[in-house]
Amino acid sequence: AGATWTLADHAYEATNSGIQIGASDLARELVGRIVGAAEQLKVKCVISPECGHAYTAIRWEGPNLMGRPFGFEVKHILEVLDDLRRAGKLKLKGTLDKPLTYHDPCQISRRGGVYEQPRTLLNQLAPQFREMTDSGVMNWCCGGGGGVSANERAEELRFTVFKRKKAQIEELGVKTMVTACANCRVVMEEALEHHHMDIEMLGLTELVAEHLDEGKPNE
């Protein structure tokens, strides 16, 4: 796509456990590593990976924790991919010829506002993309939000909450579900196994990668 990028060797972990447990000093330290690396490298944009809490930590909580605005943009990887696609710098080829649906991660969609970009990408890659009844900002949680995914004692709670998602999947009759949050993916993979559901889970970024056109992009 013609973009220059780098990966800081001392600020590569984006998930912020300090925010998850309410420890503001730790949260500030972890965000500070990323901000410090970004400023040292003089980057124009910091890209959050497929992790809802990482996106929240650096984009929305970060400036408050640091007490100042950033001199760089923060975007979710799906925002970047869709920006490149619209600019003609990222070309996709082929399609996934099977019915599938998309799970909107709470932190990315409901809180972050990133819900149009995944659909733009999916509509190009998956002609049989099907929306859940409640989607976008109204989509149901995977069952692992609010730190529940990290609590072993909350396993039954996760499986119970997932029943609503289970009903959504069964209503559509799909065998493949795509998402853009690693935490959601792990939680739902465990719940799918628990409920004996033969559903394939995919990350949208990996789906895009598998359909990249290696031809020369537009200048």
Task: Walk through the language-model features, giving the residues of each.
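Iron-sulfur cluster-binding electron-transfer modules in prokaryotic oxidoreductases
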Residues: A1-E219
